[in-house]
């Protein structure tokens, strides 16, 4: 009798779930593709000499409870205000003070979508890459919101992500994926197919051009200080590349990053700051290498089970040639989407918390140590 119940238990709680899992795998139409080897390279080649691996130890939190997932940050020096976009559709303005507790948060403009990338136009307007709306122009101190573009070459944007503004007024931006929306980001990464595009919009001619296509989740964009090229990031590839505007050619800027890049910001002082939404873990690398693991992960996600976890996020400082200088990260940190240096502080946006994270770089400098 004990043997009978033991066998039945084994059948119902082991064999049946296994058979159901196999059936779900076979029937699911999600079809991940093999990806280039850069996506699962085991080594981190871009290792900076200076490391700060306890970012949260000295961190301050700005706008706690008032900034719901502030994804990108733009700083307006004349007014000493930070502009950031939140998940509730609000572009908010935050005053910058020596004390984080003195910061004041203002609901400025609601786009009715999900504002992500933010930049300032040449005439003082605020340009917003809205994940659902497209590229927006906010002018008249927030009184007027205009849609600039939401499609290119007959293909609608699915995930307008980041925008950078050239000195001549041309806007450069990414549609991270023409197939998946913001709520489906994980499936774009797991599918392993290049759905991203780098584009430009000329406000004078109103023409939208596709500069590059077939990018792997095209994310952050930054204009070079000499205005000759852009730096753009491909998140799953762990690399950032240069796009030369006049020559229309591409070359690698930095690769083998310690994490998965999101936004990239130039600080006006010879450095770019690359946000890492998560560190590069062994589990992530294995999943990128083997499509069947990505399919299992995607099926689980459809049923509300997360098999992939994000941790050890941070911000990498590099010079104009892509040489790594310092890395500020923390094992407890995740979903960091933006890093921008304002004065002596590093401000970080994210898609997890209800605040902006700030670190005093003079009080908590990176030190010489191994990554």
Curated annotation (Swiss-Prot):
Tissues/organs with expression: Expressed in cauline leaves and flowers.
An annotated GO cellular component: cytosol
UniProt signal peptide: 1-23
Swiss-Prot/TrEMBL induction comment: By salicylic acid (SA), jasmonic acid (MJ), ethylene, abscisic acid (ABA), dark and infection with the fungal pathogen A.brassicicola and cucumber mosaic virus (CMV).
Superkingdom of origin: Eukaryota
Keywords: Glycoprotein, Phosphoprotein, Signal, Vacuole
An annotated GO BP: response to fungus
InterPro entries, per the entry: 6-blade_b-propeller_TolB-like, Strictosidine_synth_cons-reg
Primary location class: other
SUPFAM superfamilies named among the record's database cross-references: Calcium-dependent phosphotriesterase
Cell location: Vacuole
Sites of Phosphotyrosine modification: 303
Glycan-linked positions: 101, 137
Family named by the database record: Belongs to the strictosidine synthase family.
Protein name according to UniProt: Protein STRICTOSIDINE SYNTHASE-LIKE 5
Species: Arabidopsis thaliana
Lineage: Eukaryota, Viridiplantae, Streptophyta, Embryophyta, Tracheophyta
